[in-house]
Amino acid sequence: KNTIYPCPGEIGGAMVIKTSDEPLKDSFQGFGVAITGSSCYELNTMPKQQRADFLNDIYGKNGLNLSVGRLTVGSSDYSAELYSYDDVENDTELKHFSIERDMNYVLPMIKEIVGLKPGITLFASPWSPPGWMKTGGSMCGGYMREKYIECYARYIVKFINEYEKRGIKITAITPQNEPETAQNGRMPSCIWHPDIEAKYVTELNKQLKESKLDTKIWMYDHNFSGWKRVLWCFREYPELIEACGVAAFHYYEGCASMLKKLKEEYPDINLHFTEGGPRLLDNYGTDWCKWGIMMSKALNNGCQTFTGWNLLLDENGGPNIGPFFCGGLATLNSQTGELTYSGQYHTFRHFSHFIQKGARIYPSDIEFCESSMFEFPGHDINVECCAAENPDSSFVLEITNPNSSKAQLQYYKNNQWWYIEALPDSVSTIIFE
């Protein structure tokens, strides 16, 4: 356990945790994970009681208490099969639209999760329109064609309606997962020019309103490094602020601090972290500090949700279309049925268990955290901190120390200085009631 005790004043040499005087304007709306086709496939193979126990651990209040889920519109790279909801060439009237293939195991598993967590926030992302709406005619790679924008908006509205008929409410939709990459045609993907995305968002917003759907649109859904693209879209198409006013980001390139530039110019836009998960062959079970740092940075820079990647995969990171080597939040061994857990799972044990939906985030920093140049080139990584005030008035500090030595910290709270020692390679939770 970490050491924490009150002290009469500041302690020389201990780093100071600084939290802002005021919380961020928008309250935090929850942590989650992607419920991909592959995850549903794996869930469906589990014995009923094992699955119930696992899902209760992930979504129950005594477990991770996740409250957000990302769904896929048709196939993603983490699906057991490749399909859209209308693979009939040039079916612009969408007469052959059908979600039947989701009914085998995708919808049943999602409904099981919704039954366990009735208030879960579900948003959805398409990896590709039907191939016939794109250059090249394939779901794997290619560009979205402008002439199909209106038809594709109808396609998405149909998807939302079909899911809602079955008791699955889609709170938000992203136009396209990662619109700036085609992944060399290895997986369902589609490149969208920013002009095309902006025009499509306007059309989709119109059709959602006409259909009396309150589903929100979260733009972009790609890397932090693309923040300038989002800024350009809002400047070039001011109507997007009313039609959307939300942007979603992944962590594969860039850093969360880039989002400050968006907030400076458009303080009323909402931000979400929508994808980031463990790698199967890279410290899979022990990378909790990586995720403690990432979650802290995302929350400190205004992300209102934080959603990981696959909920559950097998020991080979499958099934998937690729191949790719992501790990699931948990791993189900296909031979033994044994469950093992990622470092990200253990980090959620801190963040999502203790930071409640509706919490107010106080951006945090740690003063004097830089290493001495005497240590060059073996510098430590900075200790990170996140602070949240929950709806029940409890105040939570999440401290991540990724280094091989303990971190000596101090924090002023409730008219009292507190001395804190964060253990090496640790994520720690401190609660002030």
Stretch-by-stretch model annotation:
Residues 174:
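Ser/Thr-glycine-rich phosphate-binding loops at phosphate-binding pockets of nucleotides
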Residues 1-18, 122-124, 154-162, 166-171, ...:
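Substrate-binding and catalytic surfaces of secreted/luminal carbohydrate-active proteins
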Residues 2-170, 202:
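N-terminal catalytic cores of secreted or lumenal carbohydrate-active enzymes
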